[in-house]
Amino acid sequence: MPKEFIVAIELGSSKMTGIAGQKNLDGSITVLATVEENSSSCIRKGVIYNIDKTCQCLTSIIKKLKNFLKQDITQVYVGVGGRSIRSLKNVIVKDLPGASIISQDMINELMDINRNMTYPDQEILDAATQEYKIDNQYQIDPVGIQCSHLEGIFLNILWRKNFYNNINTCFENANISIAEMYLAPLAMADSVLTDSEKRAGCMLVDLGADTTTVSVYYKGILRHLSVIPLGGNNITKDLTCLQPEDADAEKMKLKYAKAYTDISNIDPTLNYSVDKDRTIESKKFIEIVEARVEEIVENAWFQVPAEFSDKLMGGIILTGGGSNMPEIDKVFKTHTHIDKVRIAKFVTQTVNSKDPKITNHTGMMNTVLGLLAKGDMNCAGSEFNNDLFDNLDNRPTTGTGAEAHKAPRNPNETVGTGVVLTAAEKQKAEEEARRKREQEEEEARLLAEKEAEEEAKRRKENSLVHKFMRGFKKFVKDTISEEE
């Protein structure tokens, strides 16, 4: 009998990662396979810029996973992240007739209005409900409360439309069904942060190769999300000014770089080896690394809204490949004046695996493991024999794909969960919203006509002619009654 499993793919700037695993009854995860493909030639700053090469990477990952699992893959979970993702607050106001009791339908209406907001060249990926203002008070759950003025405050997560469209195009061209798209920063946050950190207020910093992602939580709610185009590769590029090749500069960074070196520990006579024939002055090397690290840290801290900078009682949590640099936590403490800094080397879930990429706990697999943890639909297809594999590995990753597993859902049910609607889902939601809007307009038109008829009737009844005729009829009736 074919085994069930979940497949997730992370589209990173340095590498694209595919993972297959199973979720156990005790909440743990068993990893069955992991595959990596170099993506530097098709993804920059977390954004797809070469669709054809991205399709090739995706196809290769699926083929390798199928080969390892000896089983078809019907659909995959996908992480969405990268440059230009940002959050923006939006307030929707609704005045109520008199003192009205707030219903869930009213809340859904606010969510629908917010979801249908348009921004130039931007796509709303998700919206995190911040709170509701009821008259002059703020509430998280306003249903059942009586008021005359209601405001919904939302944090919209925006991304460039063409970036969003490129992801959908790549998976369509590669014939891979998407089970669900998730905001990668939110999926990872749910796997590396504790509930107490989110409630107390914390700053999560994912130090990646091309980008640094900053998420701010307070009272258990996402309050800010931004991606800055700075990462570990910027340090590598700066080091090339000392004449090493890119590959050598990367190796030197991984071997020698520290985020901070006490000046008393710098030996001006010490040189770092590039290869057997070349060396670089350690002092210059240290100066370059520290300058770029400081720039990244300062820019990350600058992303935190002023209203939350003094509310981070849960501290700062660092993750991603850049968090492995020695003394990186010290630099964050120095620049933010926050002493509580934790490096999240691994997810909070129990993960069973023998793969060194996972067991080494470097923080570089946290996002894809977070995506895997989010999965709740089977991605496994039929089993096949090795003899048949060559004929099967190029089949479309569909069949019993996402549509066969996924039940229709209300878009409002996914608000704030990190779920990103696919292009097909978004189109369906827009059509449903249009039908609903047309129905409401028709109902409003009929109601207006009915009210107009009733108003005309009232005016007619109150007119002088009508009053005279009623009086005359009454006079005639009374006269006849007296004669009888």
What is each model feature region?
Residues 9-15, 80-81, 196, 204-211, ...:
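A short acidic Gly-Thr/Ser loop motif
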Residues 67-68, 82, 156, 161-172, ...:
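Phosphate-binding glycine-rich/basic clefts of nucleotide- and phosphate-handling proteins
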Residues 80-81, 258, 312-335:
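Glycine-rich phosphate-binding loops at beta-strand->alpha-helix junctions
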Residues 99-104, 198, 206, 302, ...:
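Extended, folded domain segments that form the structural surfaces/walls around functional sites
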Residues 208, 292-301:
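A general structural motif
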Residues 344-399:
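Glycine-rich phosphate-binding/hydrolytic loop that grips phosphoryl groups
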